[in-house]
């Protein structure tokens, strides 16, 4: 298996395991930046179920099927996704409160269940640590989500593995804007050409590419 580098075209053929041979190609970089939670763990279906549970408790008759949620994932931002969906349904709701409820269900699930890292992720992290390559996590999700992810991964991956971890409080604009990547570059004290980003969606890849960072596509099951 090899890394497949892309420009603005997101190819589903890029979902390959990162083996040792692939990791050795990282040696020329000063940093590797994981861009989203989905590049480390597969959570899309858990999040979909958490949304549906929140809808039910909120008194909404909404239900996101796997195929519908897959289409919704083409755009970043949970609250933004909810706002557009509510407008489509011509319903006024408190999207922040609804998203917070979904986040609670999502985090509750992660605290009670263990999730393994995606195939190859541990190889990358261990290789980078062994070769003094910095690790960044350019996520713009909530701190609660980040904490829950690392809680469920505590026996395999932890926060200390990363030199910098982003969150939604650090940026005003979500992906595909490059803001979170610009902050990550600054915190890691590196230039765009000195690092490689890994993203799981086309929308998120645009964020890295706009920051002039080379990016590899690593799509999840619903992307």
Walk through the language-model features, giving the residues of each.
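A generic structural motif
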Residues: 132-133, 213
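Asp-based, Mg2+/Mn2+-dependent phosphohydrolase catalytic module
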Residues: 8-28, 126, 142-143, 148-223
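Active-site-adjacent beta-strand anchor residues
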Residues: 41, 118, 136-140, 174, ...
């Amino acid at each position: 298996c090899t890394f497949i580098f892309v420009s603005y075209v997101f190819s589903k053929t890029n979902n390959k395991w990162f083996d040792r041979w692939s990791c050795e190609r990282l040696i020329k970089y000063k940093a590797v930046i994981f861009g989203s939670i989905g590049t480390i763990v597969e959570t899309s279906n858990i999040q979909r179920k958490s949304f549906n549970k929140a809808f039910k408790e909120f008194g909404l008759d909404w239900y996101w099927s796997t195929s519908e949620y897959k289409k919704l994932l083409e755009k970043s931002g949970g609250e933004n996704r909810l706002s557009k969906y509510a407008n489509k349904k011509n319903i006024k709701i408190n999207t922040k409160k609804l998203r917070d409820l979904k986040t609670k269900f999502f985090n509750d699930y992660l605290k009670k269940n263990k999730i393994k890292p995606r195939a190859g992720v541990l190889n990358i992290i261990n290789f980078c640590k062994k070769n003094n390559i910095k690790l960044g996590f350019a996520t713009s999700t909530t701190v609660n989500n980040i904490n829950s992810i690392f809680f469920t991964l505590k026996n395999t991956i932890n926060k200390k593995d990363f030199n910098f971890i982003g969150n939604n409080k650090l940026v005003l604009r979500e992906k595909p804007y490059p803001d979170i990547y610009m902050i990550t570059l600054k915190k890691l004290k590196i230039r765009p050409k000195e690092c490689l980003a890994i993203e799981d969606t086309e929308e998120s890849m645009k964020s890295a590419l706009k920051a002039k960072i080379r990016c590899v596509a690593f799509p999840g099951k619903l992307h």
